[in-house]
């Protein structure tokens, strides 16, 4: 266990005051290892809140550089960061918030060749991506490696999320396979309200913190959806499918798959 310094006790004092956290819980967070895939709309609030919370080891994967159109929702980046790799921009802000955090960057695309190698050292994975192929890749790699992860998806005014633990419903239990390329509009085509990314990203961050603290009920075996226009939140119960291609009784997928690109992630209704 880590012995907190006086400065750390002050920094995390509002956590430590919580009966469900305390010194022991904060020490758990300082030992935690979280990988964030995507340093964009969802990854931004997740990275900021996990760093502020004192999650001791955070990895972040993204091959892109900061673009002007990102700044409407990707709040970890600033105008001065234009053209900078997103992972480096994110690392700078995370360390500025909390120098206790160790940040590992992967300036690369996640694909079938590197996904398991990148994910393997981490305890919890945040899916902050904006395309179906990588979402299925993250799911399949995490299931194969026995890793917990939080799925998140946003489009227009809507968001959805769930959490997977080994033995609970996975992404393929909800959605069997990616839609055909081009069947779902991209965020650049359909748009997204910037604040939606913050709403969903902070939920994902809370799920990660709850996981390490062992507090409350995680969003397992249920999909949380919301519509910011109406502010209606609902949860849909989904059972693990015995016939699931990756986590079922007789899995048929025995390797990772690079699907054809089909960006954004909410089903088009």
Language model feature labels by segment:
Residues 1-269:
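Adenine nucleotide-associated cytosolic modules
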């Amino acid at each position: 266990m880590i012995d907190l310094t006086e400065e750390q006790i002050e920094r995390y004092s509002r956590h430590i005051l919580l009966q469900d956290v305390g010194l022991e819980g904060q020490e758990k967070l300082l030992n935690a290892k979280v990988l964030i895939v995507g340093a964009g709309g969802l990854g931004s609030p997740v990275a900021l809140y996990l760093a502020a919370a004192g999650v001791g080891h955070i990895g972040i994967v993204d091959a892109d550089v900061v673009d002007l159109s990102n700044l409407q929702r990707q709040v970890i980046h600033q105008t001065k960061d234009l053209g900078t790799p997103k992972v480096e921009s994110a690392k700078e802000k995370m360390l500025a918030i909390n120098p206790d955090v160790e940040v590992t960057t992967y300036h690369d695309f996640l694909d079938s060749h590197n996904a398991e190698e990148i994910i393997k050292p981490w305890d919890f994975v945040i899916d902050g991506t904006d395309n179906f192929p990588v979402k299925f890749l993250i799911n399949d790699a995490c299931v194969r490696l026995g890793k917990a992860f939080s799925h998140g998806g946003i489009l227009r005014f809507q968001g959805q999320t769930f959490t997977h633990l080994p033995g609970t419903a996975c992404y393929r239990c909800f959605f069997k396979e990616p839609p055909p390329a081009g069947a779902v509009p991209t965020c650049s085509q359909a748009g997204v309200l910037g604040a939606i990314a913050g709403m969903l990203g902070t939920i994902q961050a809370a799920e990660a913190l709850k996981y390490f603290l062992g507090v409350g009920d995680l969003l397992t075996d249920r999909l949380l959806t919301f519509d910011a226009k109406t502010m209606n939140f609902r949860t849909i119960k989904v059972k693990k499918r015995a016939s699931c291609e990756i986590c079922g009784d007789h899995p048929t997928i025995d390797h990772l798959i690079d699907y054809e690109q089909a960006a954004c992630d909410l089903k088009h209704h």
